[in-house]
Each structure stands twice: as C-alpha cells, then as structure tokens.
C-alpha cells in the first residue's frame, strides 16, 4: 500500500477509563509496545499523547491525567500533544483543551486537534480556532486541526493552521468526497489526508484508495505526492523525533 510510517494519536478506548493508572498503562502501550509491534513489519511507529476530549468532562480527573503526560512527551517516538480538542463543546472540555495547549507550549510540542462530529462540528471548529488565535505564542504552522469537512476546511486553512481530511468508508469523509473537497477548495500546502481504524466501519487502506481517486480525477503525480506524503512529512518533521525524509 506504500505506507512509510504509522502515526497514532492518543484516543478514546471505546469506554471511559476509570483511573490515572489506566491512562499510564495506555501511554506505555503507545510508546513502548506499539513501536516494537510495528517494527516487526518494518514500519516506524510514532504517537501523540493527551487525554482526549471524550474523557475531559471530569476536570479533577482530567487534570490528574495531565500531570503524568510530560514524562511521556520525552519518549523518542512521541511527536506532540494530541488529539486534543472538543467533543460536545462543553465548558469543561474547553478548559482541558486550553490546559493541554499550555502543556504543548511549555514543552515546545506539535499540536494535533480533534474537531467534533455532525451538528457540533462547525461550532466546535470556530471555537477551537478562536481559542488558538487568542494566544500569540501559538505558531499556526505547528498545529493540525483534523476531521475538516466542506463547511470547516476554509475556516481552518484561512486561519493559517494545517487541516486534516480524515477518510472513512461511511462516517467522516469517503475518498471521493475528499477529492470533491480538493477540487472545490484547492490542494493547499497546509492540507493532508489521513485514514484510521476507529470504533465504527473503518478502512486503513482509504488513503491508497484516495490516491486512485485523485488519479482518476486527473490530479498530477506531483500534486498527489504533495498531498499524501510531502505535506505530512513537512508538518511532522517540525518534531526532531520524526525521521522520515522528504
């Protein structure tokens, strides 16, 4: 499939974890076990560390989890803080988002941001962009806002941040729909596409399928290479830990 590396953000487990120790073990899995497992298949494995927005409603608990994150940011395969963001756009989620942005700034980390799904996406994206723009210390070039769709992609790119189009067979964005977005809004230098294995119907080969769709729509090989390889590498190489070459 042409995959060169795997980048895995800290994510919801399908259920809310009940202890800080549960998060500690999960972070160990991301930073110790998964790189070894991927290496058996000759794939470099990188990760992002955070408490995700679906588990950020309990402020006391979330802050206890945040306290253990800095030691994992030092791991050689951790690229930054993510995916932080919003789920239901609640006051508590905003508070934990802001505290994890501060954590990233304190440790000079890249930031990966999750935007809400369905009817909350536009409101949540606007709120996230406003929060980021209010802090002059934030370098937009070091922030990727993921899961953009037709009604949010322009907002993210025009604000100077990186935008991620997440590919799924049913939810989020199918490869043909993603290419529709590229034809409508252009293939920005701050845009990439990513696929993943989620809790719903997923296809980790969505990105190779998107490449086929791009070729069918007469995108040049240079444009395709920029979207699916050069752009991600440019963003990720801002972390000195990311070792793939352009």
Label the model's feature ranges.
Residues 188-204, 224:
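Short acidic/histidine-rich active-site segments
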Residues 1-119, 123-131, 143-151, 158:
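Mid-domain alpha/beta scaffold segments of enzyme catalytic cores
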Residues 11-13, 167-172, 198:
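Short, acidic/turn-prone active-site loops that include or flank metal/cofactor-
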Residues 121-130, 153-159, 173-182, 199-213, ...:
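Histidine/acidic-residue-rich catalytic or RNA/ligand-binding cores of hydrolases
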Residues 208-246:
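Mid-to-C-terminal alpha-helical segments outside catalytic/metal-binding sites
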Residues 39-41, 134-139, 185-187, 216-222:
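Short helix-capping segments at alpha-helix termini
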Residues 55-63, 166-176:
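Active-site glycine- and acidic-residue-rich loops that bind
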Residues 47, 83, 104, 163, ...:
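Conserved, mostly hydrophobic/aromatic
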